[in-house]
Amino acid sequence: MNDLSDVETRLDVLPASPRGAPVPWWAKIAAKVVLARALPSYGSRKAFGLFLHGNLDHNVEQHRAFVNNVLAQHARYGGAPARAILELGPGNSLGTALFAAARGVTRTWLSDVGDFATGDMALYRAIAGSLDAELAARVDLTDRATMLASLNATYLTTGTASLAAIPDGSLDLILSTAVLEHVRRAEFAHLAAEMHRMLRGGGTAYHEVDLMDHLGGALNNLRFSEAVWESPFLADSGFYTNRLRCREIVAALQAAGFEAAVTRIARWPALPTPRRALAAPFRDLPEEELRIANFGVLLRKP
């Protein structure tokens, strides 16, 4: 079993180009505040292509590669292949249950804050058809519920509270992509403690974290005071991130009892939002910290 101190952080430079529609950040906030109230259900939002919870239902190969890479990483740092796993925030696709089963996982949990995953069985049939023939033959693809049951997989949809259903020390691996930044700031320490509770000794977790604002891929979310940003008016409008920076997230995970190693960091070549526009305390942070757009962190429970 490799030591986390052996992990070398890969450093990348992110292109400075914005993401999303070419609309000013403040106009996006105004539109999202209105639309979040006009379209309260996820189904209606998804029909209009709004407030989507990921796009892995359209990026099957990207999804497969992520799951396979995380399982391989666990084998190196967790001491044994993963048999029981949890994905936090599966979003639009429950394909992780299929990809993991193909790699020997026998118990899968998937947890989200709502029921966002597609029930379109064409996606899952396509995934199953690309996997080992024996696995494909035993997966029941009648509907989403029977598929999950045939994979010994459980889909939880009430957020952190639903993690209480997972027994202490029962997991080998926890994984997520662009999830930790969406956990409410006041709930982050509790989620970290829950992850520590659920993992066995020697178990690992891997999280990809996106620190860009969800308004165009800059730092416009750091323009607001904590009182304004954390208010329900903005926090419930579909673009909330907790604004914890890389150093704070890693420190919170270590405080929960984890060993931690940052596996990669992608930085902007320069600040995408002027420092003078940022609210306190963000405007006083070191530039190297503010320029981190996204990163990966590997955890292990001693």
What do these predicted ranges mean?
Residues A161-I174:
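A short acidic, Gly/Pro-enriched loop at the edge of an enzyme's catalytic core
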